[in-house]
Amino acid sequence: MSQPIPQPPGLPLLGNIKDVDPSNTWLSLKKLSEKYGEIFQIKVLGKTIVFVAGAALAEELCDEKRFRKFVGGPIVEIRYTVHDSLFTAFDDEASWGIHHRIIAPMLSTSMLADHFTEMRDITNELMEQWKGLGANNKIAPLGDLNRLNLEITTYTLEGKRLNNLTGPEHPVIKAMEDATSEAIKRPTRPGIFNWLFYGGKLKSATKTLRAFGAELVQYRKDNPTDRRDLLDALLTAKDPETGKSLTDAQVIDEIVTMPIGSSTAPCLLASAILFLTQNPDVVTKARAELDAVIGSGKFEYAHLTQLKYVEGIMREALRLSFPAPGFNIEPIPNAADKKPVLLGGGKYQIAHDQAVIIVLAGVNRDPEVFDEPLAFRPERMMGEAFEQLPAGVKKWFGNGKRECIGKHWAEQFNMVVLTQMIRDVDFEAVDPGYKLVQDGWFNVRPIDFHVKVKPREV
């Protein structure tokens, strides 16, 4: 017989409205997962929301024969900006398949090899910038890494340099932050409040983002090239199944979606810097690997697969920082079967149409899987140790057919930047006691984390 899903005590009529802070939702869910374990639920104004924070249940929910991505809440809200793009399309929208078949080949590992040099050289510009800051500097690495992410995303995928590493911040960065932060907050407010008091923020951000996309489209049309990149495919390719191509509006949808999707990367890398400042022995081991593999020569694409310890650092940073903090799942609808859906071999049950949010703050730190789950240990993310981990704790990029289409791009970007940071510069935390602080944004990121940076001492 199924047992009740744990739930915090609530208020009459209002339910658990005080248990989740709408201005910092993921931090609230992290705390609830630490208290209630593998599964819990809340009820707000009569609506039930179920959360899974255990690795075994998360793996079960990733069975695509039983469950699928649920497009709801913030994802529906961001459709105002990007419509039925890859990230936001409903499961039954034909546009998802058309867009996916056009885009996926351009983000494959074989195509990304062509972009390695671009990633490396632009990252080197930031390293040189950091090395030239002089004594007693203080930087917030997240800000510089956001700039780097936009610069590399735009150049590798759309073929245009923004020269955004210095000078005023590109307006797209703030617009992207405004649009996504508003998307995550809108479902927590009454609709009339969104219309009366908050509509302008999303509209303004959307206008900036779509103008940026339109500029890139026009730039390519005005400057024809034989460059084979994502923008070329968006503008010229036809879906091999339907023969359809994308309209300019749909092209802009996907251009805007790309930096939103890749925004997890600077969050991860800033967190990785934090973990490295806290674990100098990890830096020593990584540099020994880098010196053995690359030496004093030029960092080349062929080196990436040889950097096993650096890859372990990246994966362990993904596990502990969970920059994309969760994803939504729902049972696959079946009009002929309205029975409750069983989880955990019948230990729990949910309604046939109940959406579930997987909370990676819990899943990635499940003590049933990880010994000392809060410790930063790259070794557990390497080789056989990594292969033996359950699939449920490797869902940093989502799951199945709706997994992040830019996964390989993100992994290569993260490896390139992480390698060059460890190889070229030394970081010192301004506040050695800093703890990971979240601010309620779309992604989890280290807020108000500052470091001193200088050329690596050899």
Regions from the PLM with identified roles:
Residues P280-V282, L389-P390, R402, K407-P446:
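Cytochrome P450 heme-binding "Cys pocket" and the immediately downstream C-terminal segment
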Residues G72-Y80, D114-L269, K285:
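Cytochrome P450 heme-thiolate monooxygenase catalytic core
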Residues R66, I358-A385:
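Conserved cytochrome P450 K-helix/beta-meander segment immediately N-terminal to the heme-binding cysteine loop
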Residues V444-V458:
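C-terminal helix/juxtamembrane-tail motif
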Residues Q3-L13, R120, P171-D178, T225-A233, ...:
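Cytochrome P450 I-helix active-site segment
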Residues S2-V20, T25-E118, I122, A140-L145, ...:
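Cytochrome P450 substrate-recognition site 1
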Residues N16-G37, A211, E215, G297-G345, ...:
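Conserved cytochrome P450 K-helix E-x-x-R motif and the immediately C-terminal K′/meander segment
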Residues T264-T277, V417:
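Short, small-residue alpha-helix embedded
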